[in-house]
């Protein structure tokens, strides 16, 4: 029976690890201060802009700014000179 009890404890260990990981993820989200969709939004905006203008990956910046009770989505796109388009 000791072997069966040993194997059952692994499920508790896995559950404990899962709970710890969820806590770590929640803490990282709180520290970042932004929702999870911002990196995806930035990549999708970059792909749409690349259809029309040649820009590098660092040309699009998306930030969420908290202004009192309001949240402001700040999108900055650095466009190249006319000669580089």
Curated annotation (Swiss-Prot):
Signal peptide segment: none
Record carries keyword Nucleotidyltransferase: no
Domain of life the protein comes from: Bacteria
Keyword list, A-Z: Cell cycle, Cell division
Annotated GO biological process: cell division; regulation of division septum assembly
Function: Prevents the cell division inhibition by proteins MinC and MinD at internal division sites while permitting inhibition at polar sites. This ensures cell division at the proper site by restricting the formation of a division septum at the midpoint of the long axis of the cell.
Family, as annotated: Belongs to the MinE family.
Protein name (database record): Cell division topological specificity factor
Taxon lineage: Bacteria, Pseudomonadati, Pseudomonadota, Gammaproteobacteria, Lysobacterales
Name of the gene: minE
């Amino acid at each position: 029976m000791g072997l069966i009890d040993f194997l059952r404890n692994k499920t508790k260990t896995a559950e404990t690890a899962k709970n710890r990981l969820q806590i770590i993820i929640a803490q990282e989200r709180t520290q970042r201060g932004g929702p999870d969709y911002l990196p995806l939004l930035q990549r999708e905006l970059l792909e749409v802009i690349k259809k029309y203008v040649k820009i590098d990956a660092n040309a699009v910046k998306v930030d969420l700014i908290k202004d009192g009770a309001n949240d402001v989505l700040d999108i900055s796109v650095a466009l190249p000179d006319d000669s580089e388009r």
